Amino acid sequence: MTRLAIGKPAPLGAHYDGQGVNFTLFSAHAERVELCVFDANGQEHRYDLPGHSGDIWHGYLPDARPGLRYGYRVHGPWQPAEGHRFNPAKLLIDPCARQIEGEFKDNPLLHAGHNEPDYRDNAAIAPKCVVVVDHYDWEDDAPPRTPWGSTIIYEAHVKGLTYLHPEIPVEIRGTYKALGHPVMINYLKQLGITALELLPVAQFASEPRLQRMGLSNYWGYNPVAMFALHPAYACSPETALHEFRDAIKALHKAGIEVILDIVLNHSAELDLDGPLFSLRGIDNRSYYWIREDGDYHNWTGCGNTLNLSHPAVVDYACACLRYWVETCHVDGFRFDLAAVMGRTPEFRQDAPLFTAIQNCPVLSQVKLIAEPWDIALGGYQVGNFPPLFAEWNDHFRDAARRFWLHYDLPLGAFAGRFAASSDVFKRNGRLPSAAINLVTAHDGFTLRDCVCFNHKHNEANGEENRDGTNNNYSNNHGKEGLGGSLDLVERRRDSIHALLTTLLLSQGTPMLLAGDEHGHSQHGNNNAYCQDNQLTWLDWSQASSGLTAFTAALIHLRKRIPALVENRWWEEGDGNVRWLNRYAQPLSTDEWQNGPKQLQILLSDRFLIAINATLEVTEIVLPAGEWHAIPPFAGEDNPVITAVWQGPAHGLCVFQR
């Protein structure tokens, strides 16, 4: 058998140099590593990696070419109590593989064993890594680098966004290619979006439990190969990377950034009864947080937690992030359950991964957004991330819903959230843009469902409606479900308008959930992670054009208001904001805490948001000057020029003078 040359210990992964392929793999506790190469007939050829530099195993295979299929068998101790679960009978995926061939099916051969090792060989059915070559013409592509103060984020699912779009060619609907289609780009531009945030596109697997129920992991928060694109979103798996980069290049030409939702907190190997794909068999003790009994710390709710304080795992995470920036030109990341990134195991702002990102000349220059919590003790860290990060602002979400749908939030609390939650984020030199304001997200009710359902309806998920949060702050306006009388429909519409206006005209960075501007409903399912069907796909034929136009007008109005785009904290007397009561007078201390839900917010001394969140029609006396109701509020209900606004119940209007 041909012996491998020693090769080089860097970079990690499999890299073709024109003459052959260099293979590298980290494992601090392995005793031997075999590279397994598969020919066109599926015949396996094994080679010991001869190089061992520190904890990096490496070797060079001359004459190997792109398209080569490979995997690893890693030898070492089976000592579960010590956290070691080596099993060379199982073929393992390279954590840095750029392409995977094969499916991650629910198969007992893809398990290593719980207390005792399963020595049945699984190479015949295990997915294989594929060596790829990186040639792509980016032409004159350049990142838009939209200032944070001008950023409008649109959270979308690659498939769900375009799968039912009638104006996109059938053969590319639901794919990376569709993201770059002129129809999609023109829509995003007309809406006013500056950043498209995609749910996970790194290759993921469906949990065995879901597969047994005939379901699949739709959202993608179950990663198995962090450097590989999910092939199901490609027209052809072999060209996935090319298609993805084509889409990014087209979006960049239109001035739209691309932000990836990335999962660095756990892997698809789940708990100890979960499948064995890669990390568990390569170096379980290093990659995961291990308890004293050898089991996993489950700080993610997914069975395991990546140890992002381990130097090698930090290097792996940074290499992954740099890959997406340098190879795919993405403009930033949203980090799922990002508190895990700072665990040492306690959360620290100077945790190793945070420090590495801060010191990286590539990663420190892109947009970084944290979902600032995990499920463990001390996991709620909203406002505590390092200055480079923006954070999902759940304070804003809950306050907006409580104010408009539950009517139980004082004006002072509402104003605090409207002003970028300065009590939470104004620290360590951070700017208002650090607050990623949202009313809805992929996780939870859609905006329409917020006004149509009091209770979640997740029966289709197969967990007897136990999954998903019960804390929704929603209001069905008197009838559970969609449809209803004209009066009911109008009241729900008014609430949607109020929530959208609050989101898009408040200080901070707004994030809009794709489909909310259409009136998309998931029929009360607030945890549709496993629903790859018409429940989650956006139905463009049923989209509300009026609501879409309303949303677009709000976004374009936002861009005209200096107080919202200059990204400076509002200070008393700086002309950015004045808070007034229904008589155009400054609010008293008592009104802030106990007053009626009526408020006027004067922005940049020229734009006025008049709010009547009470149950009664109320006269709102506008400040001195000639005020014009402006789109999307100008119309028969709001006089073109007025000094007094007849504020409808649960209504609001925006004026300019």
Curated annotation (Swiss-Prot):
The record marks 443 as: Transition state stabilizer. Residues 458-479 are annotated as: Disordered. The active site is at 336 (nucleophile), 371 (proton donor). One of its GO terms (molecular function) is glycogen debranching enzyme activity. Keywords: Carbohydrate metabolism, Glycogen metabolism, Glycosidase, Hydrolase. Disulfide bonds: none annotated. One of its GO terms (biological process) is glycogen catabolic process. Its EC number is 3.2.1.196. Pathway: Glycan degradation; glycogen degradation. Residues 458-467 have a biased composition (Basic and acidic residues). It is an enzyme of class 3 (hydrolase). It catalyses: Hydrolysis of (1->6)-alpha-D-glucosidic linkages to branches with degrees of polymerization of three or four glucose residues in limit dextrin. InterPro entries: GlgX_C, GlgX_Isoamylase_N_E_set, Glyco_hydro_13_cat_dom, Glyco_hydro_13_N, Glyco_hydro_b, Glycogen_debranch_bac, Glycogen_debranch_GlgX, Glycoside_hydrolase_SF. It comes from the Bacteria. Removes maltotriose and maltotetraose chains that are attached by 1,6-alpha-linkage to the limit dextrin main chain, generating a debranched limit dextrin. Belongs to the glycosyl hydrolase 13 family. This is Glycogen debranching enzyme. It comes from Shigella sonnei (strain Ss046). The gene is glgX.
